[in-house]
């Protein structure tokens, strides 16, 4: 208990001041920040960094307290501006810039915790979202049951504010935060739902939601370490700062009342937990009743600690060999490969059946076509269409854009067990590129291909990947064919895109 108190005191000393550096420290405006949040695999957002300036945020926060500058039209609903600008645009600027400022100290704190855990050397290798799949290939084939869990989120923004207050020291920060979430948001929309706020202020909502997930995972990891025979080394523990022990005792009492045991009953050394965004995968090798205990643990944790309602029927426990789960834009399941081996001992011959488990990862073709249709590359049936908005660009720019999209898709989905779906997506993009160029030159597709040469024109769509692989591996046709059949994970993919978002 003493070491826990020391940890709590040390963690309280790390509470941050936010408004002081935001308002008074000029050097913070020179910080370069990477805006990977809105990057899309289909279209790059231009001018994102120029729109959200910390200097503008500082001026807006200063003017929020000057009431004579605030001009609102309560009777005229057609006027949607104050200070001479659009309200939603000002709100977006404040939320984005505000999220940028508060992310900086927490990122530095995460880096310091990684140094304390002595895994800072491998931190760069863990940044790639593709690093999850080699881990699943090594571990998941030894497990028997899997639970696909969608993490519930609070229905009220005040719950997210209460979670954030464990880390923040200055009270004016919360006055500004509640002003923005309650009063300010009421100017923008009559619907005060959290879904509306998440759509209008995605970056700021993502910041608050990440802290909710961080707090819930910190308690889970803390209790997991106490209930496991093995010691976890690759996790940093961030558990709740205020009223942690009374809540923990209450949670233990709930389990003792329901199951007549404490957390020591839920000892499962062979369990793995993987999360990305709002979905997590829980896999276990032991009997399903232990998975059921962890299921009820998550439900009680969300209800008792965070006042978040979760329906038990939404958490299913399925045999891994019979169930496919979706994670990071892939469909994954464990396939059983059966083979018969003939064994002979003296004059007796035996047939031995060997079952080998293999992780099968496939590309979800329907969500991919839906994403392409949303980006106006094809219709909902997968038939390619032209991209008229790109017709004003040069031929080189149009081809370069389509090649960049194909390259991103090829890199991301090269880990698939079957490449047929990936080749179909490339075919859709190739025909969409041809139709876009034909639309620009005001000719038919057949006439354009006849004039430019169909074989040489779009050969880059299929030869570029082979040229890259030939630089790494020997120029052998059999080697390249084998590489096309096998999975290749690119461990330099650092940003998410529309394809991996859980809907």
From Swiss-Prot:
It comes from the Eukaryota. Keywords: Chloroplast, mRNA processing, Plastid, RNA-binding, tRNA processing. GO terms for cellular component: chloroplast. InterPro entries: Domain_X, Maturase_MatK, Maturase_MatK_N. It holds the Pfam family MatK_N. It is found in: Plastid, Chloroplast. Usually encoded in the trnK tRNA gene intron. Probably assists in splicing its own and other chloroplast group II introns. HAMAP family: MatK. This is Maturase K. It comes from Vicia sativa.
């Amino acid at each position: 208990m003493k070491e826990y108190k020391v940890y709590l005191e040390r963690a309280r000393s790390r509470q941050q001041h936010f408004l002081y550096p935001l308002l008074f420290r000029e050097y913070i405006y020179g910080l370069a920040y990477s805006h990977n949040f809105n990057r899309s695999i289909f279209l790059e957002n231009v001018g994102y960094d120029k729109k959200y300036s910390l200097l503008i945020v500082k001026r807006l926060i200063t003017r929020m307290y000057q009431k004579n500058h605030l001009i609102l039209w309560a009777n005229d609903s057609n006027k949607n501006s104050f200070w001479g600008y659009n309200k939603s645009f000002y709100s977006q600027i404040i939320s984005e810039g505000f999220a940028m400022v508060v992310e900086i100290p927490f990122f530095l704190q995460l880096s310091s915790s990684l140094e304390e855990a002595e895994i800072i050397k491998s931190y760069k290798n863990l940044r790639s979202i593709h690093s999850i799949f080699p881990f699943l290939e090594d571990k998941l084939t030894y497990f028997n049951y899997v639970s696909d869990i969608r993490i519930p989120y609070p229905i009220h923004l005040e719950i997210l504010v209460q979670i954030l207050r464990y880390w923040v020291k200055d009270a004016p920060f919360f006055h500004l935060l509640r002003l923005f979430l309650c009063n300010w948001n009421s100017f923008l929309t009559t619907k005060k739902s959290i879904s509306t706020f998440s759509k209008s202020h995605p970056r700021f909502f993502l910041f608050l939601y990440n802290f909710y997930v961080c707090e819930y995972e910190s308690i889970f990891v803390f209790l997991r370490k106490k209930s496991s025979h093995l010691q976890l080394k690759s996790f940093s523990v961030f558990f709740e700062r205020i009223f942690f022990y009374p809540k923990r005792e209450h949670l233990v009492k709930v389990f003792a009342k329901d199951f007549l045991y404490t957390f020591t009953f839920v000892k499962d050394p062979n369990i793995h937990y993987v999360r990305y965004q709002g979905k997590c995968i829980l896999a276990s090798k032991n009997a399903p009743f232990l998975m059921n205990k962890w299921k009820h643990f998550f439900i009680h944790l969300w209800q008792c600690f965070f006042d978040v309602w979760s329906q038990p029927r939404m958490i299913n426990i399925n045999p891994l060999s019979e169930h496919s789960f979706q994670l990071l834009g892939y469909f994954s399941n464990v396939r059983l490969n059966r083979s018969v081996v003939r064994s002979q001992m003296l004059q007796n011959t035996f047939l031995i059946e060997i079952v080998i488990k293999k992780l099968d990862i496939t590309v979800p073709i329907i969500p991919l076509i839906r994403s392409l249709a949303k980006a106006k590359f094809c219709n909902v049936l997968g038939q390619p269409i032209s991209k008229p908005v790109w017709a004003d660009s040069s031929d080189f720019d149009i081809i370069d854009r389509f090649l960049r999209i194909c390259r991103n898709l090829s890199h991301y989905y090269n880990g698939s067990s079957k490449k047929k779906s990936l080749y179909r997506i490339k075919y859709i993009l190739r025909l969409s590129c041809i139709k876009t160029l034909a639309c620009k030159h005001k000719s038919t597709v057949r006439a354009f291909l006849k004039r430019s040469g169909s074989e040489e024109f779009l050969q880059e769509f299929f030869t570029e990947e082979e040229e890259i692989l030939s630089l790494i591996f020997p120029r052998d046709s059999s080697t390249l064919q084998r590489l096309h059949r096998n999975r290749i994970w690119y461990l330099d993919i650092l940003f998410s895109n529309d394809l991996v978002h859980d809907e």
